[in-house]
Amino acid sequence: FIPGVSRWSPFHSAAFAVTESLPKLAAVGCDPAEARLTFQEYFERLGNKPERWGKPAAALLGALTAQAGYGTPSIGGKDSMSGSFNELDVPPTLVSFAVGMSKASHTGTALLQHSGSKVYLLQIPVNETTGLPDYKNAMVLMQAVCAGVQDKSVLSAAVVKEGGAAAAVCKMAFGSKLGFTFAQGLDAATLFAPYEGSFVVEIPEDGVLADSLAPYATALGTVNGNGIFILDGDVLTADELIAAWSSKLESVFPTDSGKSATVENVPLYKERSIFVSQNKVARPRVFIPAFPGTNCEVDTARAFEQAGADPHILVAVSYTHLRAHET
């Protein structure tokens, strides 16, 4: 989800939100074609203004188009239509989360691995007429990246968001404090355009990009072990970039409390014999009604059972007078 895109077109934003969540699965080695989605929607208070009602309608249609295009249904979500305070409104928001399963041995990372590795931008294919993702070919690209992550021919992979490929490369390098030398002659769009859902992938220094990935690829540069970033003669260190990246919200979500922590030496706990009373104790019975719109009855029953009670759940059915009476 990119707010700037959603202000321009809630329809396109929702379609690309799905197109961002599925590649994130592919980048860690999980087959996006087998994914399921869940959405989080957040919109301004609608009132009686038709143009406001049009925003969630457009967003949901965009998300539905993407679900049909990729063959990946949304099976859950949560929405809110109260994102207004006085004259302030939230941007039209539909965030997509993709969920899937993969073997631990197949999973990958977004962390750059080795000095000398080559890094490429794999741009998600877009329909030039509609400006929407080319769903069929986009899924082909996602599955090709997933296969590369699983067979380890792709050493690391990340998904492009705000800031473009340049920001993605930097964040991939921050964890290991590796540096990066950008290729000469890259234009601003290649580096900084928010090609949402596109990939940045690392392959070995002596490796060759797979034929299934080559049609989408633009060479971004090579990883260096110096902890410096070089772009058209400009040089910045990893520490400088990390400071700039993290300082934006430092006053809101501080990463440094300014206090030194005291580390206590806690000895290992050794389990001893447990003595259980031979005397019988009362086991209270607990009635837990589950009404329409409520939840957590199973968790509540489990908690009572662990405390020694005998819980009983009754689902209150009220869709007819007879069923309500039976309940």
Feature map (PLM): residue ranges:
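Conserved small/polar residues in nucleotide/adenosyl-binding loops
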Residues: 320-327
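Intein/HINT protein-splicing elements and their conserved insertion hotspots or analogous self-processing inserts
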Residues: 2-6, 51, 56-58, 73-195, ...
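Short hydrophobic/aromatic beta-strand micro-patches
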Residues: 200-204
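Short amphipathic alpha-helical face segments that pack within enzyme cores
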Residues: 16-20, 164, 168, 299
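Aromatic/hydrophobic pocket-lining residues that form π-stacking "cages" and hydrophobic walls in ligand
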Residues: 21, 63, 145, 169, ...
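Short helix-loop-beta junction
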Residues: 174-175, 298-314
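A glycine-rich phosphate/pyrophosphate-binding beta-strand-loop-alpha-helix module
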Residues: 8-83
